[in-house]
């Protein structure tokens, strides 16, 4: 079965948010409930990302790098930050 490109995380049993899997196999998760590192979606969201092998990624100093699995998320990202993260991961 092929993975869906777009998934709501409520479908997966998580908090409010969504996941996107790009043609390069990388996945980004954007969460914005009261139980995340965000302001509940008022102005910020929590973001996590994985490469096509399932390795966790962090975006820092304008580049994606692999981090220890589940060790951190990108907290309190603005709308502009989320847009940049989505675009750069889709091109990685």
What are these model-predicted stretches?
Residues 1-92:
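Catalytic phosphate/metal-binding cores of nucleic-acid and nucleotide-processing enzymes, i.e., regions
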